A protein has these predicted regions:
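Short, extreme N-terminal segment that most often corresponds to the first beta-strand
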Residues: 1-52
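Short, hydrophobic beta-strand segments
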Residues: 5-11, 56-59, 69-73, 125-141
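Alpha-helix boundary/N-cap detector
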Residues: 14-21, 63, 146, 150-153, ...
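Polar/charged, Gly/Pro-rich intrinsically disordered segments
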Residues: 19, 54-68, 179-194
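Conserved short hydrophobic interaction patches
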Residues: 26-33, 78, 158-161, 165, ...
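Short, intrinsically disordered low-complexity segments
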Residues: 32-111
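Amphipathic N-proximal alpha-helical interface segments
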Residues: 102-103, 108-127
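Acidic, proline/glycine-rich low-complexity IDRs
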Residues: 120-194
Length: 194
């Protein structure tokens, strides 16, 4: 069963007031794909995700965090959420041989009052890496182990880089169903080796 994979980051309490600056820093650190890719999208919502976006803008070519920052700064408030849907490079398996290609990623920043934020324990920053199968062993695909290992290393390197660069109080890498991704990965690795 495929599931969405997320990294949720909660900033130190005193850093929440500058969350947009930290989101811009996250964007500068993120390894966006430089390959040919579909459009990226920047979206800004107020109050909650059921409301129409205040802004939704398509962007062509590789994402440039420096070009996005002024757009984000035009919309500020505790009930604002910023979302960037873009691409990063992962090994992927289609009908042919594995290939390094752009994979969808969504990077988000949530104001403390967005979607009843703090009351619901909402994270400050989130990275949605798409389906977890890009990071899990695929025994039915011969030779996939080294490519999956490369994807997992890229993911872990990114997690540690974000933790080092941002004032993170707490982080959680999990699937949409709430399953702990590290536990699931470990179980599948044991089953693959056995």
């Amino acid at each position: 069963m495929t599931d969405q994979l997320y990294l949720s980051l909660w900033l130190n309490r005193h850093s929440r007031a500058t969350r947009l600056r930290h989101f811009e820093q996250l964007l500068k650190l993120f390894p966006f794909s430089q390959r040919d890719q579909p459009q990226s999208t920047v979206s800004i919502h107020a109050i909650d995700s059921t409301q129409p976006p205040l802004l939704e803008q398509a962007l062509n070519g590789p994402l440039d965090p420096e070009a996005i920052a002024p757009i984000l700064r035009d919309y500020q408030g505790d009930d604002i959420a910023y979302s960037i849907e873009s691409w990063w490079d992962l090994w992927q398996f289609g009908d042919s041989d594995p290939k390094l290609a752009p994979a969808r990623v969504t990077l988000s920043c949530f104001g403390p009052d967005f979607d009843d934020g703090l009351a619901s324990g909402h994270e400050d920053l989130r990275m949605d890496f798409g389906v977890d199968t890009n990071f899990l062993p695929q025994p039915e695909v011969p030779g996939s182990a080294k490519f999956i290992e490369s994807n997992v290393k890229s993911l872990l390197r990114l997690v540690h880089q974000m933790e080092s660069a941002l004032p993170v109080a707490h982080r959680k890498l999990e699937t949409e169903s709430g399953e702990n991704f590290a536990d699931r990965l470990q179980q599948l690795l044991k089953a693959t080796i056995a």
